[in-house]
Every structure is written in C-alpha cells, then in structure tokens.
C-alpha cells in the first residue's frame, strides 16, 4: 500500500472545524444560554435601578421641598395642590429646587475655624494668618497693608446693600457645596467674619437681608488678619503643609486664610501666585468637585496692587457671586454607571471559567492527545479552538451591548459604541489567550473551574474596594496604577471605570460621554496598550509552553539548565545495579532480539514498522523514595504484518512503554523508530501513520459513531468517496452500521459498542503502526471473535502492538509475544514456542472426596515419581508431570483403575497453557 500522506493544514483545520461545528450544534442550548446571560444580568441591573429609584431617587429628601397648599382635603389624606420652593426646603432639598433667578451671594473668603489656629490654643487671641512672599519685601509689605479694610460700616436698608458689603473682606469658616445656589456660609447658623487689621468690640454687628424668598439674620464678627512676610515660597509651602490638620506631624495645627507669592511684581507688571487648599474640593477627582473660595483671594491682592499704583481710593469691588439659572431637578443616580465597573467586570470575566474549563476538560479526558495521535497538528487545533472561543465571546459581548442599550442602560448609550466594542474585543482576545496559557497548569477541570471563579469574583471585589480607591486617590503614584493595570482583571476594571465615569458625568451635567477625542485624555490609551501587549505576550508564552510540553520537556528547562546538577550517586548506583542484573538475567531469545535491532539500525532498514533500541524510562523518586525504573533497556523490532502481544502483571512497564511510543512521555534514554522516524525528534510525523486504541474510550458523548470516524478519517487525509467508503466499511466491520447504530450519539452506546468504535477509529485510514491497549475489554464472546477478525485483517499492512490480559486473545491474534516483568522483557517468541519452552509438563486435575486425597497422591506417584502437587483445596488437586516421564495412555489407565477403588467426581488431563507459561515466567522474573 502507498505510504500515508500527511493531511495539509487546511485539511486538518477543516476536519476539526466540522467536528466542532457538529459538536456545538448538539450543544446549541448550552451556547444559547451562555450568550443570553448578558440579557439576564442587564435585567437584574434594571431591577436594581428600579429598587434604587423607589427608595432613593424618589425619596422626599432628594427633591425640592413642598407643602400642601390645598386646605380642603378629599378625606383620603392626599394633597391635591402642592407648593414647592426654596422656603420649604432643607439644606439637602434646596439643590433640587428651581432657580429661575438665582440669588446673588456674598463672595466670602474661607478662613480656618478657631480650633485650627494655633494662636487660639496658645494665647487665646485668634488672628487669621495671611502669608506673603516675593522678590521685593518692601513691595510685599506695602501690598500686605492694602489687603484688608480698616473699618466696617454698612446700611442694611440701602439699595446698594451688597455694594456696601463689597468694601469689606468678609469670610466664613464654612466650606462650600457642589453648587452655589445655597452657600452654607450664609444659610447656616455660623457667623460671618470681617477680617480687619485690628478688632474692637464695636466691630461686632448684626445684619438682616433678603434673598427671596428667604430672609436672613446674620451676625458679623471681627477677626484680626495677621499679615506675615516669609523669605521665599519654600517657607510658605512648608508652613502651609505642616500646619494643615491632616498632614502635620508636629501636632501643631495652624492653617492660613490666604497666601501669596508676588514673584517679580513691580510697578510695571503684576505677577502673583495664590495658594489655596485643594482638599476642600472633596475626595472625588474626576466627575464632581466642590467650589473653593478662591475668587475673594484674587480680588484682595488685585485691589491691594491697584491701591499701590493709584492710591487708596481705587478699588475693584467684588459685589457678589451667582449661579446659572436651573429648572427643578431630582436626584439622578444611574446604577449602571455607579456599580458598572464591578458588575460588568463580573459579566465579562464570566467567559473565562467557560473557556478554561473547556480546555482543561479536553486535556483531562485526553481528547486533545488522542486527536494529536491520529494526526491533528498543534496549529490547526489552536487556530480552530481560538476561533470558536472568539466567536462565542464576540457574540456574548455584542449581545451585552445590544441588550444593555435596548433596556436603556446609560453605561452603554452615553459612550461611543466603537470605543466600547474595540475595548471589549481586545480584552476577550486577551482573556482567551490567558485561558490557553494557564490551562497548562491544570489537570482537572473542577480545580480549574474553582480557581477561575475565584479569579472572576476576586478581580471584581479587589477592583471595587481597592483599585478604584487608589485610582481616585490624589496621593497614590500614577506609576503604581500602571503597574497594577498589568493584572488583566484590573485593566478590564479600569476601562469599565472610565466608561462609567463618562456616562455618570453625562447623566449628571449633560457633558458628552466618552468619544474618540477623549481617548488620550482618559486612561483608555494606556489600557489599550497594556491589553494589546499582554495579548501578544500571552500568545507567545502559550506557543512556547505548548511546544515544550508536546516534546515532553520541562517547561522551564531553559531556566534550570545553567544550574542542573549531575546525577546523584544514588541514581548512578541504582541504574548500574539494575543494568548489571538485567545483563545476567537476560535470556537467549531476548539477546537475539537485541542483536536483530542493532542490525536493523545499522542497515537503516524500514521494513520494520517499530524498532526500539535499549529504551529506558526512569521516574524520579519523590519524598525520599528511590527512583522507579519503569522500562529497563527494552529492545524490540516489530515488522509490518506482525501483531506483537505484550503480556505482564500490573506495573510491569507495559503502559510506560506505550506512552513513550505514542509521545505521551519522553524516554529517559535509548531510541525508538517508527517507520524510520525517531520518536524523540519526529513525533509529529510519526502521528501521520499511527493509530491508537487507548485502554479507556476517549469519545465525545454527543457525537455519533459515524461522526467520530468522519473526523478521524479526514485527519488521515481521506476525502470524498474514499472517506465515506472507509467510514462505512469500518462501521460494518465492528457491527455498528446496521439498524441506525452509526447515527446514535456515542454517549448512548454500551461499553462494548464504545470499545468497538475505539478500535474502528484506530484502524481507519490504514495506519502503518497501531497500538491497542486491551482492545476487547468488556465485549461479549461473539463480538470479541468478530473484533479479533478485524484486527487480524488489519495487521496485513501494519505493525501492531497489543497489550492484553486475555491469554486466548493473545494466542489468537499475536504472531509473537513478549512477557514483561519489572520493566524487563523476560522472554519473546510465538505462543507455541513459549509453551514448548516454558511448558514441558502435563497437568492432571482430579476431584474426589477429601478422605481419598491420599489415594490420589499414591496413584500419581505410581505414574511418575517426579510429579508434584501444585494445587489443593477441598478434594480437588492438581499435579504437574514431566512430559518425558509419562505417556498420556498411562495416565488414562491409572485413573480408570482408581475409579474401581473410590469415587472420582471429575478429572482432566491437559497440556501446558499460555496462562501457565505467563504465571511461571512472571513468578520467575519477580
């Protein structure tokens, strides 16, 4: 027959694609449930929003205050007419009221409360400090004297009430709010302070003024302003920083009211720097900040400079500050924007456990390795698997965006859809790559699933309660934010956080959501860069690890080699001892097989499908245990057309040998060739001409028997009519064709049917080398005989290595047998040779009553004095006779004579069986 031709990349990819497509069609509802998960979660978010609206957004405290204007109730206690306005509102409610004509407010300066002024604590006098520095101390002193007014007189009934107040420097200890519709300095019970160079008791006044619809009565107290010169700005910075209540390490709080650096100001130019406390803006840095009372500081120093230039009569009066008109509003808190980062982090990361578990499941069930053994290359596997997960993930993300927008989530609707899609698309690629990368670290799907879900929920929680706090912290270094974003969960969270902030701003104040023009101004450019780089790195790392694991090398061998230690004395001694023992104990037939192997290697013969030369496998000892020598110097040559049977007790090394030959593990030493190809260097080429029937059936439960064979047939480069014919013949040969059995999912097959399908898979495409591990396990006698016939027919054009515990199967199928004990080949030959070599005796089995056991022993001794008892229980005895000492007729005659003296219930006389040979060799080799 022609040499098998390797399937091309496209052929392999097509085979896997069709198999996966069929598999996914059978699991369509699982895929649908996965894709519509975003819909369920978006509905949950809508429900949360509805609950929040009813409890918070629609609360009386979060809307303009009202009172009932209808005295005539309808008896149901409901108010028909309400009157709402500022006069009925609390401080919290006022911000929601309509302000068609916002009232003018006093431009107050913020001064520290008395508890934050060190002089109040030490001396009892409480001046407020104003710091001044600059290049010209003389000019600075002059301007300092012009900062404050020296008297306070005002007529509250005058039409120019605010203008009269503007001649004074009024201040308050109250911080501002997020708007200027109601200034806490005026609307609170706190007094207003007039800052003067000197205070007298007469400077304490009371004022009454109206800001429709409200009227205020405020007490105006005098507070001394202490102007202090400092040599440079460093001293000012140091004094402000150390005196602030939150940062002083000397426990001396001395905050200042204002601070100026006049720099190079002179009569020809006015150049000044003004200090103020940014802390009063609030904790959030991006979307909402409080006002700070800087305008009055600017006006003070400007007036001081004008008076320096033009005299004391020249001033720019700062009459009032005023907000823009606004309509009545209500609290608008969009939950999708508030909890969007953590919520959608969980939503998107939910794909990660699905991908990782799927990959690990294929590895755990050894589905990938069985595909590889039948010719599927790594590149087609990764490409098709990646494409499938990318398609599912993309559908998932698109559905998330569509569902979220359809039900009105502002998180999606307010931000540019192209930016969102690009971000999600890049991240799901990174997520798939990371799943491929970390799948190599797991061997069980359950463990992988648990770890993946910990990663999912842990990333969301850490992002919300740690990472977001650090993002919003003004003091946390930005470079460490970048380092934290290298963790994929945080890079996802940061991108979602940016979307939520832009959506929140749009909902709060009407500014645009995120657009491409905002890309560089936000953190998205940084996040995109991190995701793209990590995606590439993850793909490269995955490729490296997969190549290393495919060649059975240590993943981190390149790190260990420089420090690799020489074999330990224990290891060397162990190997030498075992080698010496094996040389002494090797039989002539085993030695002859070694000579044959050496001759074949020397001649570079390709007539033998399998050639193994001194193949060894040593497993390193653990926990102080010595190394385990699983296969000890095996030499074997199996020509095409031969079925070689491997017999041996459990743990003899048969499985280790098969694993080496199929590429699951790498030999510790020695070499092996399949069709002239070295299994250590050319395993990918070996797979082209190889078929494997594993001990445990490796099948897809939802694929039919026919679909299994179509897939593996395509991997063997069968196409069109040849493929269909090969599949049909394979199904017929193992009795899985008639009655529609071929179109039944393999999950519904019986154990025997699955076994027959596994054999058919191993033989499809006429492989040149086939490994079968107990192929007839679980079959009924009729099916077993039929399967043996199929295997016997297949060996005409292939070299087959078969392991079995059935002596009948070994005798029927195998041209030669090898018995393994303790990692060594004890004997080799065809069944008749082995029985002749290790048999040499007959076995008499006879059953009588227990009281006649001695009579039976006497009878046996009369026939052969060298006979020995090998079995005895409850009247049944077995005796072994040397063939050269007895004749069969003598035994028959002796038993017939014995029947006249006592009752013989049953008896039998047999030649040595293969099982007897196996037991004898196994006992001898142990």
Curated annotation (Swiss-Prot):
Q: Which GO terms describe its molecular function?
A: ABC-type transporter activity; ATP binding; ATP hydrolysis activity
- Keyword Plastid included in the entry's annotation: no
Q: Which GO terms describe its cellular component?
A: membrane
**Where can this protein be found?**
Membrane
Q: Which Pfam families match?
A: ABC2_membrane_3, ABC_tran, ABCA12_C
Which InterPro entries does the annotation name?
AAA+_ATPase (IPR003593), ABC2_TM (IPR013525), ABC_transporter-like_ATP-bd (IPR003439), ABC_transporter-like_CS (IPR017871), ABCA (IPR026082), P-loop_NTPase (IPR027417)
- Per its UniProt entry, which superkingdom is the organism in? Eukaryota
Entry-linked CDD domains = ABC_subfamily_A
**Topology relative to the membrane:** Multi-pass membrane protein
Keyword list (alphabetical) reads:
ATP-binding, Membrane, Nucleotide-binding, Transmembrane, Transmembrane helix, Transport
Q: Which SMART domains match?
A: AAA
Q: Which residues cross the membrane?
A: 34-54, 336-356, 389-409, 418-438, 451-471, 525-545
Answer yes or no on keyword Cytoplasm. no
The residues that hold ATP are 648-655
Which residues does the UniProt record annotate as the domain ABC transporter? Answer: 610-847
Identify its protein family. Answer: Belongs to the ABC transporter superfamily. ABCA family. CPR flippase (TC 3.A.1.211) subfamily.
What's this protein's name?
Answer: ABC transporter A family member 6
Organism of this sequence: Arabidopsis thaliana
Name of the gene this protein is made from: ABCA6
């Amino acid at each position: 027959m022609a040499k098998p031709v390797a399937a091309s990349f496209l052929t392999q990819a097509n085979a896997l694609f069709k198999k996966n497509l069929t598999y996914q069609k059978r699991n369509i509802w699982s895929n649908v449930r996965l894709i519509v998960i975003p819909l369920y979660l978006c509905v949950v978010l809508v429900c949360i929003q509805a609950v929040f609206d009813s409890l918070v957004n629609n609360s009386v405290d979060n809307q303009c205050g009202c009172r009932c204007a209808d005295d005539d109730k309808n008896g149901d206690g409901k108010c028909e007419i309400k009157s709402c306005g500022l006069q009925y509102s609390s401080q919290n409610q006022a911000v929601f009221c309509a302000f068609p004509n916002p009232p003018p407010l006093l431009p107050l300066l913020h001064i520290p409360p008395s508890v934050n002024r060190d002089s109040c604590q030490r001396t009892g006098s409480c001046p407020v400090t104003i710091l001044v520095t600059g290049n010209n101390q003389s000019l600075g002193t002059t301007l300092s004297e012009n900062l404050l007014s020296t008297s306070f007189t005002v007529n509250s009934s005058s039409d120019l009430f605010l203008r009269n107040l503007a001649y004074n420097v009024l201040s308050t200890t109250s911080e501002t709010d997020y708007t200027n519709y109601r200034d806490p300095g005026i609307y609170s019970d706190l007094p207003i302070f007039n800052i003067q160079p000197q205070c007298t008791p007469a400077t304490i006044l009371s004022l009454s003024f109206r800001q429709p619809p409200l009227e205020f009565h405020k007490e105006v107290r005098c507070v001394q302003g202490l102007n202090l010169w400092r040599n440079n700005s460093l001293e000012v910075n140091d004094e402000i920083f150390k005196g602030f209540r939150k940062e002083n390490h000397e426990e001396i709080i001395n905050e200042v009211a204002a601070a100026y650096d006049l720099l190079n100001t002179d009569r020809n130019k006015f150049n000044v720097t003004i200090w103020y406390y940014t802390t009063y803006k609030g904790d959030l840095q991006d979307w909402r900040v409080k006002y700070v009372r800087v305008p009055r500081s600017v006006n003070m120093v400007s007036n001081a400079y004008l008076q320096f230039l033009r005299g004391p009569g020249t001033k720019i009066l700062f009459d009032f500050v005023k907000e823009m008109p606004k309509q009545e509003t209500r609290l608008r808190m969009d939950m999708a924007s508030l909890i969007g980062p953590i919520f959608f982090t969980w939503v998107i990361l939910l794909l990660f456990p699905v991908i990782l578990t799927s990959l690990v499941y294929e590895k755990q069930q050894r589905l990938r390795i069985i595909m590889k053994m039948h010719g599927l290359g790594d590149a087609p596997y990764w490409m098709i698997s990646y494409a499938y997960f990318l398609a599912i993930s993309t559908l998932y993300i698109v559905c998330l965006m569509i569902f979220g927008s359809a039900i009105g989530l502002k998180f999606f609707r307010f931000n540019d859809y192209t930016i969102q899609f690009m971000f999600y698309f890049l991240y799901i690629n990174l997520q798939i790559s990371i799943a491929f990368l970390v799948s190599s670290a797991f061997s069980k799907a359950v463990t992988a699933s648990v770890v993946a879900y910990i990663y999912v929920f842990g990333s969301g929680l850490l992002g919300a309660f740690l990472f977001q706090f650090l993002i919003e912290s003004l003091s946390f270094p930005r470079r460490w934010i970048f380092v934290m974003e290298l963790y994929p969960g945080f890079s996802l969270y940061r991108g979602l956080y940016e979307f939520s902030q832009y959506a929140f701003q749009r909902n709060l104040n009407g500014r645009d959501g995120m657009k491409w023009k905002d890309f560089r101004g936000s953190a998205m450019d940084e996040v995109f860069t991190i995701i793209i780089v990590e995606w590439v790195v993850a793909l490269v790392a995955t490729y490296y690890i997969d190549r290393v694991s495919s060649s059975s090398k240590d993943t981190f061998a390149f790190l260990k080699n420089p420090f690799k230690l020489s074999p330990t004395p224990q290891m060397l001694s162990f190997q030498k001892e075992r080698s010496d023992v094996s040389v002494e104990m090797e039989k002539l037939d085993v030695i002859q097989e070694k000579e044959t192997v050496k001759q074949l290697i020397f001649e570079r013969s390709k007539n033998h499908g399998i050639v193994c030369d001194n193949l060894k496998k040593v497993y390193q000892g653990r926990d102080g245990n010595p190394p385990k020598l699983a296969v000890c110097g095996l030499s074997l040559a199996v020509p095409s057309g031969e079925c070689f049977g491997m017999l041996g007790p459990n743990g003899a090394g048969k499985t280790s040998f098969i694993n080496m030959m199929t590429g699951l593990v790498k030999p510790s030493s020695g070499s092996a060739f399949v069709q002239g190809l070295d299994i250590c260097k050319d395993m990918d080429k070996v797979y082209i001409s190889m078929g494997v029937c594993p001990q445990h059936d490796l099948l897809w439960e939802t694929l039919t028997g026919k679909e299994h064979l179509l897939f593996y047939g395509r991997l063997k480069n069968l196409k069109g009519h040849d493929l269909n014919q090969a599949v049909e013949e394979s199904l017929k040969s193992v009795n899985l064709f008639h009655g529609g059995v071929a179109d039944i999912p393999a999950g519904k097959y019986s154990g025997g049917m699955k076994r027959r399908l596994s054999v058919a898979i191993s033989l499809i495409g006429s492989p040149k080398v086939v490994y079968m591990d107990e192929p007839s396990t679980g079959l009924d006698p009729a099916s077993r005989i039929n399967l043996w016939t199929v295997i016997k027919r297949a060996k005409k054009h292939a070299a087959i290595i078969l392991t079995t515990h059935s002596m009948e199967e070994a005798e029927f199928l195998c041209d030669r047998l090898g018995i393994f004990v303790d990692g060594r080949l004890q004997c080799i030959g065809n069944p008749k040779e082995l029985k002749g070599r290790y048999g040499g005796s007959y076995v008499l089995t006879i059953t009588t009553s227990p009281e006649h056991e001695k009579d039976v022993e006497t009878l046996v001794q009369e026939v052969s004095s060298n006979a020995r008892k090998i079995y005895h229980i409850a009247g049944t005895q077995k005796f072994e006779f040397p063939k050269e000492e007895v004749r069969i007729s003598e035994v028959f005659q002796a038993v017939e004579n014995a029947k006249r003296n006592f009752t013989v219930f049953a008896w039998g006389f047999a030649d040595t069986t293969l099982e007897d040979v196996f037991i004898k060799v196994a006992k001898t080799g142990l």
